[in-house]
């Protein structure tokens, strides 16, 4: 009996070790055969340290499935890009003359029509409300650009006018002295040196101003009314004297 017990005790560790060995082999084989579950196997090394490794391998069938899925995604992307390009590509609306006249009159009434006004115009002109809205946006942009150009040109003209006003020549009262004071006469030369007639006319009395025009260096011609000639005055004085003498003789 004792020998049989010893034999059973000695056999138990071997059976347990065999069971554990079979269990671990099955686990390792299951992990190696099914790597998609993402499990990690820890293998004991000779020095007693554990290392982790992830096995990644795919079968040809899995590769084909992945390729087909990628192709499907690429086809869907192509369809999306085609639809977006079709949305971005809008047809240009050609307005008739009557439609443009109606739109222009509505724009003169209001630059920013509300939704109800746009819908009424669209129904009246047989257009889409979005087309009417786009036309008003473009018309407002054109109007703003025209106003900016107009304001810029008016400012330029105003600046030019101010510059011309500042550059205007000073005005002088009409007289011989003021004309001679203008810087047209060369410096360092007296007027009587080159223009003796002008100086002589300045020295004359008002009753002795000649009838000929006075010409200045710049070509300006001055004409003044001349008083009665001295001969006419002497004749008047002589006639008056004769009449007085005749009256005196009659009285005597």
From Swiss-Prot:
GO molecular function term, any single one: RNA polymerase II transcription regulatory region sequence-specific DNA binding
Record's compositionally biased regions (Basic and acidic residues): 155-164
Any GO BP annotation: regulation of axonogenesis
SUPFAM superfamilies on file: Homeodomain-like
PANTHER family linked: HOMEOBOX PROTEIN UNC-4 HOMOLOG
Domain of life: Eukaryota
Deletion phenotype: Worms are unable to crawl backwards because VA motor neurons are miswired with synaptic connections normally reserved for their sister cells, the VB motor neurons.
Protein name: Homeobox protein unc-4
Assembly: Interacts with unc-37.
Pfam family, one: Homeodomain
Ranges of Polar residues composition bias in the record: 43-59
Family from the record: Belongs to the paired homeobox family. Unc-4 subfamily.
Organism for this UniProt entry: Caenorhabditis elegans
Keywords: Developmental protein, Differentiation, DNA-binding, Homeobox, Neurogenesis, Nucleus, Repressor, Transcription, Transcription regulation
GO cellular component: axon; nucleus
Lineage, opening ranks: Eukaryota, Metazoa, Ecdysozoa, Nematoda, Chromadorea
Localization per Swiss-Prot or TrEMBL: Nucleus
């Amino acid at each position: 009996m004792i020998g049989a017990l010893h034999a059973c005790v000695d056999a138990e560790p071997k059976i347990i070790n065999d069971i554990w060995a079979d269990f671990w082999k099955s686990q390792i084989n299951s992990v190696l055969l099914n790597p998609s579950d993402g499990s990690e196997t820890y293998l004991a090394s000779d020095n007693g340290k554990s290392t982790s490794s992830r096995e990644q391998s795919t079968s040809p069938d899995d590769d084909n499935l992945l390729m087909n899925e990628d192709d499907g995604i690429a086809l869907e992307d192509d369809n999306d890009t085609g639809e977006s390009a079709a949305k971005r590509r809008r047809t240009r609306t050609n307005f008739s003359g009557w439609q443009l006249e109606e739109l222009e009159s509505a724009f003169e009434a209001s630059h920013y029509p509300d939704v109800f006004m746009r819908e009424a115009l669209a129904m009246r002109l047989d257009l889409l409300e979005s087309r009417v809205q786009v036309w008003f946006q473009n018309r407002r942009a054109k109007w703003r650009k025209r106003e900016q150009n107009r304001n810029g040109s008016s400012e330029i003209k105003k600046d030019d006018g101010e510059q011309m006003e500042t550059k205007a020549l000073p005005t002088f009262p009409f007289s011989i002295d003021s004309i001679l004071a203008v810087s047209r006469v060369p410096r360092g030369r007296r007027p009587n040196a080159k223009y003796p007639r002008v100086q002589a006319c300045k020295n004359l009395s008002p009753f002795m101003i000649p009838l000929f025009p006075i010409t200045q260096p710049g070509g300006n011609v001055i004409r003044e009314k001349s008083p009665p000639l001295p001969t006419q005055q002497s004749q008047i004085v002589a006639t008056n004297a004769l009449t007085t003498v005749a009256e005196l003789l009659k009285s005597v």
